[in-house]
Amino acid sequence: MTKTIPTTLRISLPIIVLMLLQIGRFQAIAEESNGQLPNIVLIISDDQAWTDYGFMGHPTIKTPNLDRMAKESVLFRRGYVPTSLCRPSLATLLTGHYASTHGITGNDPSPKYAGQNTEKYQNQRAQLISKIDRFTTLPSALGAKGYLSHQSGKLWEGSFKNSGFSHGMTRGFPERGGRHGDDGLKIGREGLEPIANFIELAEKQDKPFFIWYAPFLPHTPHNPPERLLKKYQTADRPISIAKYYAMCEWFDETCGQLHNLIDDRKMTENTIFIYVTDNGWIQDPTSKRYAPRSKQSPNEGGTRTPIFFNWPAKLAPADRPELVSSIDLVPTILSLAGADVPGSLPGLDLTDAIRNGSKIARKQIFGEGFAHDIADINEPEASLLYRWCIEGKWKLLLTYDGEVNRYAWTHPRSVKGPQLYNLEDDPTEETNVATAHPDIVARLGQAIADWYPVKKRKTVPLSINDRP
């Protein structure tokens, strides 16, 4: 006699399966929380194009250590940073919020309104640093879960303690040389001893650890070791390009050294390595500086980055096609550490996606760009230059009339009206197809407006290169 499953039970089976999967996920996190919490290493390169890795297909630059890690990772090739300038981008990684929310929109107060050596300017710098005090930073939140944390490399928001780290290298403003890292900028370029000592300390105290590794690499000065520079020097390659390529490999070497520090102590099985860059960079072949449409710009050369999660013991390698953003890293790291994820964070917790391969339930990501020099410390919108939205293959870019001051050459703002690009067919954003797709412009434009309203700034209808 054939037995049939009752209809109600047949309908319930998929729900039961989903519930069991979720229970399994939360049990796994609970086991880590009640047992051994994972160590977390956040690797942040400084000024590197999304194309400039072996695993991203660069034909010349050698990055064997990151290639190996990426191969063993959940890799998102379409990662982005919301803001393509180091200080606001790093502040997003510390707070989990967009620059328009955390208020650290540029690197420095504008010298237009107060000379850099004046008391007024120094007070503005201090006021800018104090904005981080309004947030529970990522290292602070992890500290509440029992983590020790170590800062090395670039840090703008005062000393390492001011940003919530238990240990670190940066002394911070107002000490001499305290603009964006001071002693912390030695990491990588002068070895990794401070990190090695910290790992040893955490091991002795039997504490989980969080490492913020944000070396001044491949950032200028482009002064790579001669042994690396020779590999990239050719008769037909500009020396500025060769130096930049060598800097990328030098950075990769330090990532391998960092991985070895943990592997040699047999900690790799319980350590998550996460990779992102702070902003992009396209090397100018004729000078030491970056080319247009890269750093500080809202274009792919400024905002796009690979993002990967490397934890072979727990995460199956995968090459994911979805859009992700550095805005997602704080909620994801907190979740992986078994900590509460505040509902106020705008990013997504990617834990299910990287653990279980589930699809990411998001259609659009957003970004914004501000001037390097902050026109008004208390009004982020005063320096607003760009907002953008990506949905699938489409990218809408809107340009605003915020004040630029220095670096005007980086922000020509000469394109009339909205810019729409088909990134699938035109990844370098050469052809503006806005007039051919007014419906897409309207839809994504409304999405940007819904993201947050602009009160004073207006979109740029024509060239305002000389206007504030």
What function would you assign to each model-found segment?
Residues A28-P38, S45, A49-W50, L75, ...:
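Long, internal low-complexity/basic segments
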Residues H97-N197, P292, G402:
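Catalytic-site neighborhoods of secreted/periplasmic enzymes
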Residues I61, N260-A318, S325, P346, ...:
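Histidine-centered active-site microenvironments of extracellular/periplasmic hydrolases
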Residues L192-I199, K230-T271, L336:
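A long, amphipathic alpha-helix that forms part
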Residues H58-L90, G96-T101, G143, L148-H150, ...:
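Short, structured active-site-proximal loop/turn typified by the sulfatase FGly-forming signature C/S-X-P-X-R
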Residues L37-A49, R68-M69, L93, L142, ...:
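Beta-strand elements within well-structured catalytic alpha/beta cores of enzymes
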Residues I195-Y244, N279-P292, D439, R467:
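Active-site His/acidic residue clusters
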Residues W281-S287, S294, L315, E322, ...:
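C-terminal cap/loop subdomain of S1 sulfatases and analogous C-terminal strand-loop tails that border
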